[in-house]
Amino acid sequence: MAASGKLGTFRLPPLPTIREIIKLFGLRAAKQLSQNFLLDLRLTDKIVRKAGSLADVYVYEVGPGPGGITRSILNADIAELLVVEKDTRFIPGLQMLSDAAPGKLRIVHGDVLTYKIEKAFPDNIRRQWEDDPPNVHIIGNLPFSVSTPLIIKWLENISLKNGPFVYGRTKMTLTFQKEVAERLVATTGSKQRSRLSIMAQYLCNVEHLFTIPGKAFVPKPEVDVGVVHLMPLVQPKIKQPFKLVEKVVQNVFQFRRKYCHRGLGMLFPEAQRLESTGRLLQLADIDPTLRPTHLSLMHFKSLCDVYRKMCDEDPQLFAYNFREELKQKKRKGQEKDGDSESWGF
């Protein structure tokens, strides 16, 4: 569990409240960007405390919006705060915070999904992967629309040790829809167990810190929000390429209500599906009647290890996509029907 940090000695001078900032700059949450503002500084302070000590830490905040969490971070005795904001409407309010904290806040107008953070912080804070985490922390109240693709992107970055993880095992404290937060931490056998559970837990220690009621946000979302802490593991629990693990996990969970052999079969071309699926399950020592939600990380490790060997034996296997095979069969069927019609059959 992340140790609770204390807010530091540096304090921002008196400033307009977040609500006043919103009114001053005529800000409205953009529905198409799934924006929701957290105005209660007691809650933003709690997020920062739960992140652990941020003293002398370089913080990367994603989606700062009007600057609620930004203020709490600036009061946490940090080394520097880098914020990346896509919506230009928020830049003037963030600039006001930057002026109030000289040398502490750096603002980038950009998209967090494409922003390159590898050179944003000093090289001397980098740590070896096996060492303690670096003095870098990612914090963010993520827009619902980007939270899942963003965490998947960062999980792949962890596996490759690039992006924000070029500095080492960078910690993350992030908000998600409560349902997504529950999936991230879901244990074997729970109904929330999903693709996201496996992808996060094979690479990180994941903890659901606390839940923020939806009514705390403006505008009020239809769901509550979970605050989640992720710490990259020194050694992943599945030592295979990220794309391979992702393919196996995706195929299994696309038929989450079926027995696991149903989804695993989609890893193989139809002509060899029955035989290859049986071989995969036998070599991995997996009961074919287990449901996807009842497969443990060790089960997935075995499946990925065996599938990797099968891909090594057949170099074309990994590129196989059962949906493409279905499309080709459909096209051939349509062509056959067309030929029949042209001959008057």
From Swiss-Prot:
Q: Does the keyword Kinase apply?
A: no
Q: Provide the primary localization.
A: mitochondrion
MF terms per GO, please? Answer: DNA binding; mitochondrial transcription factor activity; RNA binding; rRNA (adenine-N6,N6-)-dimethyltransferase activity; S-adenosyl-L-methionine binding
- Cited CDD domains: AdoMet_MTases
| Record InterPro entries | KsgA/Erm, rRNA_Ade_diMease-like_C, rRNA_Ade_Mease_Trfase_CS, rRNA_Ade_methylase_Trfase_N, rRNA_adenine_dimethylase, SAM-dependent_MTases_sf
Q: Where is the transit peptide?
A: 1-27
Q: Which SMART domains match?
A: rADc
Keyword terms of this UniProt record: DNA-binding, Methyltransferase, Mitochondrion, RNA-binding, rRNA processing, S-adenosyl-L-methionine, Transcription, Transcription regulation, Transferase, Transit peptide
Q: Which Pfam families match?
A: RrnaAD
Q: What is this protein called?
A: Dimethyladenosine transferase 1, mitochondrial
Lineage, top ranks: Eukaryota, Metazoa, Chordata, Craniata, Vertebrata
Which gene underlies this protein?
Tfb1m
